[in-house]
Amino acid sequence: MPIRTRHRSSPVTARALLLLAVAALVALVAGCGSPDYTYVTNSTDRTYLKVPTTWRQIDGKAMDDAIGFDPTLTEEERGLWFEAYDADSAPSPVHLFGPSAPAPAAFVGVQQIPETARGQFSLDRLRDLFYPVSPSARQAAELDPTSGVSDFVLVSDEVLTPGKGLHGVHSVFRYRVGDGPMQMMDQTAYLNDDASKLYMFFVRCSTECYEQRQREIGNVVSSFTVRETT
């Protein structure tokens, strides 16, 4: 009867296989790399946005100072949650509110609306949240030498009705802010069914920047999501 001989892997072979497995795992993890996006989440108000990891958050205190908030008030007392991001190497509120954003800068927020003010938010009011966009607001800005904006060009304007009571407006337009170069603004605003919450988002940068980074900006814009409960 033939004798079957069992061959054991030598210690060297076993160790080599183990090293290969570890190397493959390391390569797999390295291939995954760091996340491409930062996920901005407001779970309470079910509001979501994703921005490239190269867009860094603007300091909250700097934002408070730029907007003029009382720093002693809590988010709940303000009735406002917001975050701001900037793709510039030196993130600053100036890139959101100043004459020029050389790289994309974005703002996302949710405002609680007092019951006494809930009837005041028309679609045009949503259009004019950050800049004068509606015809009446533009006319007023043109007549006001202190408005700080000029050379308006409307690129697109779309009424949004995603369902579950949400309704809003998505507007894309160009403006010159102060003496700066032309800026491209892309903004979206929603109201919930009883107008108790205002969801807002905008991103801006110079027209040259926008042309160069349109796909990147478009991915951020399309990621802005509100999941209002029924």
Cite the ranges covered by each PLM segment.
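Bacterial N-terminal signal peptides that target proteins for export
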Residues: 2-19
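Bacterial signal peptide processing site
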Residues: 33-35
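Short aromatic-glycine motifs in intrinsically disordered, low-complexity regions
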Residues: 37-50, 137-144, 214
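Proline-anchored loop/turn motifs at beta-strand termini and strand-loop-strand connectors
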Residues: 44-66
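Soluble non-cytosolic domains of exported or imported proteins
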Residues: 46, 120, 124, 207, ...
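Surface-exposed amphipathic alpha-helical segments
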Residues: 55, 195-230
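Conserved polar/disulfide-associated segments of primarily extracytoplasmic proteins
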Residues: 61-193, 198
